[in-house]
């Protein structure tokens, strides 16, 4: 199995968080998976892509910053209380707590130091701009859209196991774009497929019986769920939204799905799943990707 970095260089994008006037820095694996499903449908290769996606070896992570190298999510639950210097005064403790709270992503080379108690400032990878748009012929025709504008040296990447089909779909997707308001020109990107640095690839795993961090917003299969919740340190994220039916020309609300956010840490790996979240009586499956790839924590 060959993992690759799929590096995407955007100019502007709208990665929504529920409203037009907000935008995130990155996106979860289910978003790019949905985009790949639509891309494969346009190319007449949906069945082939779904057959590949349902194989155990298929892998897809959330998107993370790439700035002179890969960044990873902050490991949730670290550093442990006993790893923090207890000799500092109260003001310094508060300052360190604020640093840790603001931190979203860590450069790969800083992850182990963070696990062992060293704190880092949050890197600025992008700014969120607000753009005013016009909708002619509609009441209240002015509206605002938040966009993520990346710094010149920042891209986003996902990790996936390389295949000819995935390469073809990702190459096509760079022109279709990712995220919202694509008709306004947001979300297109330049794609670069690179080998994964050895110091990262050596710690990627799907089956490990010691401490790990999920690189994918994921949901365990039922048999693994209870143990993951008991032994893990995690944040839950809600996946919701609407699905469009061409048969009725209407939007229907998808089933809500709660998953472990990337950066969640566990005592061992678990098996994930692809969940059908179609609305009641919807004519076809609506798939939500929740199969994790893990990073070994060496603490």
Swiss-Prot record:
InterPro entries hit by this protein: Csm4, Csm4_C, RAMP_III_fam
Summary of subunit composition and partner proteins: Part of the Csm effector complex that includes at least Cas10(1), Csm2(3), Csm3(5), Csm4(1), Csm5(1) and mature crRNA. The Csm complex is elongated and slightly twisted with a maximal length of 215 Angstroms and a diameter of 75-80 Angstroms. It has been modeled to have a central protein filamant of Csm3 subunits along which the dsRNA helix of paired crRNA and target RNA binds. The filament is capped at one end by Cas10 and Csm4 and at the other end by Csm5; ssDNA is thought to bind to the N-terminal HD domain of Cas10.
NCBIfam families the UniProt entry points to: cas5_csm4
Family, similarity comment: Belongs to the CRISPR-associated Csm4 family.
GO molecular function: RNA binding
Provenance organism: Streptococcus thermophilus
Keywords on record: Antiviral defense, RNA-binding
Pfam families: Csm4_C (PF17953), RAMPs (PF03787)
UniProt miscellaneous comment: Encoded in a type III-A CRISPR locus.
Protein name: CRISPR system Cms protein Csm4
Gene: csm4
Task of the protein: CRISPR (clustered regularly interspaced short palindromic repeat) is an adaptive immune system that provides protection against mobile genetic elements (viruses, transposable elements and conjugative plasmids). CRISPR clusters contain spacers, sequences complementary to antecedent mobile elements, and target invading nucleic acids. CRISPR clusters are transcribed and processed into CRISPR RNA (crRNA). Csm functions as a non-specific ssDNase. Base-pairing between crRNA and target RNA to form a ternary Csm complex activates a ssDNase activity; target RNA cleavage suppresses the ssDNase, a temporal control that prevents uncontrolled DNA degradation. Viral RNA transcripts probably tether the Csm complex to the viral genome, recruiting Cas10 ssDNA activity which is able to degrade DNA in the transcription bubble, spatially controlling the DNase activity.
Transmembrane portions of the chain: none
Any GO BP: defense response to virus
């Amino acid at each position: 199995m060959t993992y690759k970095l799929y590096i995407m260089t955007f100019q502007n994008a709208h990665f929504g968080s529920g409203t037009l006037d907000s935008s995130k820095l990155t996106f979860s694996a289910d978003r790019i998976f949905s985009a790949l499903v639509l891309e494969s449908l346009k190319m007449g290769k949906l069945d082939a892509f779904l057959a590949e996606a349902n194989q155990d070896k298929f892998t897809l992570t959330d998107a993370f910053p790439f700035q002179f190298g890969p960044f990873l999510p902050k490991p949730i639950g670290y550093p442990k209380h006993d790893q923090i210097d207890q000799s500092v005064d109260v003001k310094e403790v508060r300052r360190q707590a604020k640093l840790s709270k603001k931190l979203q992503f860590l450069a790969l080379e800083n992850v182990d130091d963070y696990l062992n108690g060293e704190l880092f400032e949050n890197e600025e990878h992008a700014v969120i701009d607000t753009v005013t748009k016009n909708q002619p012929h509609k009441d209240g025709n002015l509206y605002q859209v938040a966009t993520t504008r990346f710094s010149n040296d920042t891209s986003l990447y996902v990790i996936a196991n390389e295949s000819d089909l995935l390469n073809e779909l990702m190459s096509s997707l760079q022109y279709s774009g990712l995220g919202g308001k694509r008709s306004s020109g947001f979300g297109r990107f330049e794609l670069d497929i690179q080998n994964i640095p050895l110091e990262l690839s050596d710690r990627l795993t799907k089956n490990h019986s010691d401490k790990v961090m999920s690189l994918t917003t994921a949901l365990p299969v039922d048999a693994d769920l209870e143990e993951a919740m008991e032994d893990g340190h995690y944040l839950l994220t809600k996946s919701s939204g609407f699905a469009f039916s061409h048969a009725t020309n209407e939007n229907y609300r998808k089933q809500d799905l709660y998953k472990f956010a990337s950066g969640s840490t566990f005592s061992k790996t678990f098996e994930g799943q692809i969940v059908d979240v179609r609305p009641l009586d919807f004519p076809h499956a609506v798939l939500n990707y929740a199969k994790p790839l893990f990073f070994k924590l060496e603490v």
